[in-house]
Amino acid sequence: MKFAIVIEKDEDGYYVVKVPSLPGCHTQAKSLDELMERVKEAIELYLEVKKNVEDGEFIGVQVVEVKTG
């Protein structure tokens, strides 16, 4: 399987990756090589856990207002 990933570099110099099609699947590393290894592992673990967990019952979508400033 192939997955699109989004890579960013944070203010501490770490590379951070997320997998948009797998909510909550993300990792970080100091180098791009290490990041690619870690994201593959994160995806594998995500898929392994997902197949062993039943999907919850969809309840709905709500809008929440938060005041800032």
UniProtKB/Swiss-Prot annotation:
<dbReference type="InterPro" id="IPR051404">
    <property type="entry name" value="TA_system_antitoxin"/>
</dbReference>
<protein>
    <recommendedName>
        <fullName>UPF0150 protein AF_1072</fullName>
    </recommendedName>
</protein>
<comment type="similarity">
    <text>Belongs to the UPF0150 family.</text>
</comment>
<dbReference type="Pfam" id="PF15919">
    <property type="entry name" value="HicB_lk_antitox"/>
</dbReference>
<dbReference type="InterPro" id="IPR031807">
    <property type="entry name" value="HicB-like"/>
</dbReference>
<dbReference type="InterPro" id="IPR035069">
    <property type="entry name" value="TTHA1013/TTHA0281-like"/>
</dbReference>
